[in-house]
Amino acid sequence: NSMGLAIVASLVTVLIALLLVFAARYFKSHAVHFSNRLAILGYSVPGAVIAMGILHLNGKINSALDIVVTGSLLTLVAAYIIRFLAVAWQSLDSGMERNCGQFNEASKSLGASAFTSLFRINVPLLRNALFVAGLLVFVDIMKELPLTLILRPFNFETLSTRTFDLAFQSKIPESSVPALCIVLAVIVPVVWLNRKIETGK
């Protein structure tokens, strides 16, 4: 559950961050700039606060449309996106500023569409930044507890919630197993990032 959920949420988060960063740098309008600033506020808000806000919004949607979205994986993924969009945004924004600025201006002057500029110029130049952004979001999601604990579907367990449940029951030795799995799952990308940074230096 943890790996699959983290991978899907990371991919969607990175895609949204890429579109936001590109739009801000390509179109340079106040509305797009404001949307970017608004989108990355989630990282400064506690996960429990975001979860309660989403639960309130879900209640309104449930009553208005007569559908049930509370306690679904879609809700949980949306919460992860709101919470960790800033992580991916920062990585991609710095990568685009470093690698793509002059190429975007050149493509605009040559009449290339925004779609062409994004996928034929920016994405190839941002491969490393995209990968790093995905890894950072993946690591954060793997260890996120408040959001997952409040918004998870019934009988849906992740490594973080399993660790919490066992620790809450005072089963400390048993809780060390999922906790160790979290460490093992995130240590590979962390080591890779450290080596990447050292190589860059």
Model-derived segments and spans:
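Membrane-interfacial helix termini and adjacent extracytoplasmic/periplasmic loops
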Residues: F27, A31-S35, A48-R83, F115, ...
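Hydrophobic transmembrane alpha-helices
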Residues: L38-V45, L74-L85, L135-M142, R152-F154, ...
